[in-house]
Structure formats: structure tokens, C-alpha cells
Amino acid sequence: MNITSPLSAPSHQYPDALGRFGNYGGKYVPETLMPALTELEEAYYRYRAESSFQEELAGLLKDYVGRSSPLYFAERLSAHYARPDGTYPLIYLKREDLNHTGAHKINNALGQVLLAKRMGKKRIIAETGAGQHGVATATVCARFGLECIIYMGVQDMERQKLNVFRMNLLGARVQPVTAGTGTLKDATSEAIRDWVTNVETTHYILGSVAGPHPYPMMVRDFHRVIGQETRQQALKKWGGLPDILLACVGGGSNAMGLFYDFIDEPAVRLIGIEAAGESIVSGKHAATLTMGKPGVLHGAMSYLLQDKEGQVTEAHSISAGLDYPGVGPEHSYLKDAGRAEYYSVTDQEAITALQRLSQLEGIIPALETAHAFAYLETLCPQLKNGERIVINCSGRGDKDVQTVAKYLQMEI
């Protein structure tokens, strides 16, 4: 069940020629970056249409990443939500955690490094929060022999020591970012500064469906294989489509990868789950689509967490990968269009969900992913018997063991 043409044209034609998803997206960048973005856009359109690019990408996704990832029926987790009359919804996991490097991030990193190689770029930079995108980027750079610099906030480096070591082991240089809050927003800002300075030799592998055009489109397209496989696997397993797709949302790449091929299927609910952090009322959260307002960050118009003066505020989440005050512009568009729903869950709810999945299914999810599982507590009681939910199990939780132990006040 391998996808042989992961970048074929969809019927949902966004972004437009200006890189906009309705009112969102675009290119809000310094003039020095415009030629690089134009070069990247032209190269992407050119190479994605070439059969040799398609074949190389499909071959690596199969033999290097290990695709297709399974669609797994979580029997005990489903039964956990049984009602007194014995009825319950059916929960399936799209197992992106089983990919090489342990998350969905490798899909995009691999696609972009093939693009960079064809563009003649010898130096690769990236930002990372949870470290999974950094590890994926370091991995593909090792595979293709390219110089790799990863920008990572010092707070995230402390939370994700295991992934920092993995990146170093893979030959990347991890550049600590002390500015601001020392988290993903600041790492992204530093990576953009580097790119402005070294634009001739360097390709920036942005890790989410955020940033200026063409990144939201390009990253979505490289992750689209998730939804394409899900459709094929669902049709094979039960002869229909899922009733609900559920995914966590930080920048929003794993969710867009799952959602995109179902946007034109109105019977399929699309639900994204953000980080409510300590709580929404505390102000310490990363619930951008729930609580934010439109504004510009990192080159694109989208929903942002802002204060009354329009300044971007700090985000908070126990999960480094959701700790971001913005979101991809296509998610903002889907929210306003009413096509996707967005809710939030707290740190505590995510930790509890991580424990629940671990103990019921023997699968330890990433803290980011656990936010989606936490929403089952709210969602499942509302559903009819036999309704099918597909959750994007976007990453494994090895990287989060220390964070979880610290939160639970347990010694390792």
C-alpha cells in the first residue's frame, strides 16, 4: 500500500498564486529573502512534477523511512470508552511514531533535502522545539552528506537532552538560542536570521506548515502521504472513510498531513488539539486558534497569541513541540471556514492520556501526541457506537520520559 505519487494535485486548491489561504499566509519577509523564496517556490513546482523526484522520494519513504505506517486498531483503548450498554466508538492509530527517527517529521525533512540537493545547496539549517524535526533534519543531512546546523532554544535543550545528543551523534551542530524565552519561536527567528545572511549557499528546512510561502504548502504536501495512506488503509480495513480525524496542533504539520486529503469529504470531521498548558484562564498556554487573533509572525499572517498592544505573547506547554504562539496559516483558514474544529487540553490531561495509552496499548506517545489522545475523554462520550476515529500518533515518547518523570515527581 505504498503511495507512488505523493505530490499529485489535490482538488482543494490552496494556497493561491500569492501563497494565501483566504486571508492568511503570504510572504511577510525582508526584501533580502524574497529572491530565495521565489527560487524555492519555482524549484518546488519544477521538481515535484518530475517523475525522477517522485520516484526517489517514494523509494526513500518506503526503504529508508519504512512507509507505509500502519493503521492500528486500539482495541483496549476503544473498550475503555465503553458505555454501560457496551457500545463504544472505534479508535485507530496512524502509527507515524514507527517511522525512522520516531515521528512524522522525517517525511518533510526528506522531501526538502532532496529539493535542496537539486538546488545545489550544500548547507542545511533548521529550527527545532521538541527536537524531533532537528533529529529528522540531522538524519537526512547525514544520509546525503550535507552540513547541518540546528537552532534550538536553551529551555528546549534542557527539556530534550536526549534529542540534543542524538543530533550531535548524527553530525549536526546544535546552536543554543538564549534570546526571548529560549523556545521554538526564538529558535525559528534565529534560523531565519541565519538564512538571510547565508541565503546563497543555505537551504532552511522549516519544520512545520508555518512561515512564508511556499513553506506551508510545501511542508503540507510532503506530509500529505499520511492522509493518503489513511484513506487507502481505511477503505481496505472497513470499506469506508473515518468519521473523525484527530491530531495535535502546534505549528500544525502532522494535522495538515492527516487532514489534507479529507478536506473535500464533508462527512469526515477534522479536529485539532492545542496545548492549554497550565490552563486557559492562567494565561500560560499555547492555544493559538482557541484564544489568538490574526497577526504576522515568521513571515506569514495567521492566528497568534497577542497582548492588547498586538505584541506576540509567550506560549506555554509541557510539550516543547506545541510551545509556539503561532500556527500554520492553512489551519487558520480551516478554522474560519468552519471546516476544522480546534480545542485544547491541559498539561495534566496530556500526562494522564500518555499514561493511559501506555498502560492500555503498550504504546508510549510523545507529549505532543498525548494532547490528541487526551481529547478522547471529551469526544468519545458524544459518539455513536462504532463511529471510527483515526488519531495521528505523530511521535513516540522516549524523548519525553524525563519530562514526564519530573512532572510526576518520580526519580529515574
Curated annotation (Swiss-Prot):
InterPro entries: Trp_synth_b_CS, Trp_synth_beta, Trp_synth_beta/beta-like, TrpB-like_PALP, TrpB-like_PALP_sf. One of its GO terms (biological process) is L-tryptophan biosynthetic process. It catalyses: (1S,2R)-1-C-(indol-3-yl)glycerol 3-phosphate + L-serine = D-glyceraldehyde 3-phosphate + L-tryptophan + H2O. The keyword Transmembrane does not apply. The modification N6-(pyridoxal phosphate)lysine is found at K105. Pfam families: PALP (PF00291). The keyword Lyase applies. Pathway: Amino-acid biosynthesis; L-tryptophan biosynthesis; L-tryptophan from chorismate: step 5/5. GO terms for cellular component: cytoplasm. Its cofactor is pyridoxal 5'-phosphate. Belongs to the TrpB family. This is Tryptophan synthase beta chain.
